Amino acid sequence: MLSKQIPLGIYEKALPAGECWLERLQLAKTLGFDFVEMSVDETDERLSRLDWSREQRLALVNAIVETGVRVPSMCLSAHRRFPLGSEDDAVRAQGLEIMRKAIQFAQDVGIRVIQLAGYDVYYQEANNETRRRFRDGLKESVEMASRAQVTLAVEIMDYPLMNSISKALGYAHYLNNPWFQLYPDIGNLSAWDNDVQMELQAGIGHIVAVHVKDTKPGVFKNVPFGEGVVDFERCFETLKQSGYCGPYLIEMWSETAEDPAAEVAKARDWVKARMAKAGMVEAA
């Protein structure tokens, strides 16, 4: 029977680094999480996952079954290095190939949502042509995802092109496809000059998951919970009152910390306390 508990997950990069998914999922279970979000970033090491053998993919599936901890989503940030908006045709083609492989990987191991980075380009200067290429790349990507029944969900970013739900909704309306949705990060959303509550309400019906982290203006990573500008209780209240019932993912980068598990446990308790104050009693 499906649980009515609010699904709470942890980002892979919060946990100790390594390639043993059975150990990672066992640790996540011990720490009280329902799921882990996989990272496929721009490093060769994590990109190589998209070329895993059948046996390696099956090992992940078996680890999920054995532990009961799901891997329902992938954070695909590799497009920083190989952007869909690149004016270099070879780089852009590589970005589309990464997308194809990621969708196939997701289909094979049961990942339902691929979170996309909302960058047309990252290390280059953006212009009208990079934005056009990005739009066209998204259109091609969503066609692939539709055939595979895998949802692509764009993150609200630390970058002006996609720094609000309102902007992301523009792409959702442009693509007009149920396999393209939104994956807001309440930290990124709060670090810009946004009406956060209005933005969250505007996204309801398109939000498939929520990243939870703290931020400061101009500082989007590694801000300890409670030391930034995010009004967590109001964000959680707004999402609850708007009818959002989906997963929340604590995003941290503590994999190289002296004691990652202790850092994660501390963050989990802090976040769950704010959820409880917001009336999300299932999270207490």
UniProtKB/Swiss-Prot annotation:
It catalyses: L-ribulose 5-phosphate = L-xylulose 5-phosphate. Pathway: Cofactor degradation; L-ascorbate degradation; D-xylulose 5-phosphate from L-ascorbate: step 3/4. InterPro entries: L-Ru-5P_3-Epase, L-Ru-5P_3-Epase_Enterobacteria, Sugar_Epim/Isomerase, Xyl_isomerase-like_sf, Xyl_isomerase-like_TIM-brl. Its EC number is 5.1.3.22. GO terms for molecular function: intramolecular oxidoreductase activity, interconverting aldoses and ketoses; L-ribulose-5-phosphate 3-epimerase activity. It is an enzyme of class 5 (isomerase). It comes from the Bacteria. GO terms for biological process: L-ascorbic acid catabolic process. Induction: Induced by L-ascorbate. Repressed by UlaR. Keywords: Isomerase. Belongs to the L-ribulose-5-phosphate 3-epimerase family. Catalyzes the isomerization of L-xylulose-5-phosphate to L-ribulose-5-phosphate. Is involved in the anaerobic L-ascorbate utilization. NCBIfam families: hxl6Piso_put (TIGR00542), PRK13209.1 (NF009688), PRK13210.1 (NF009689). This is L-ribulose-5-phosphate 3-epimerase UlaE. It comes from Escherichia coli O157:H7 (strain EC4115 / EHEC). The gene is ulaE.
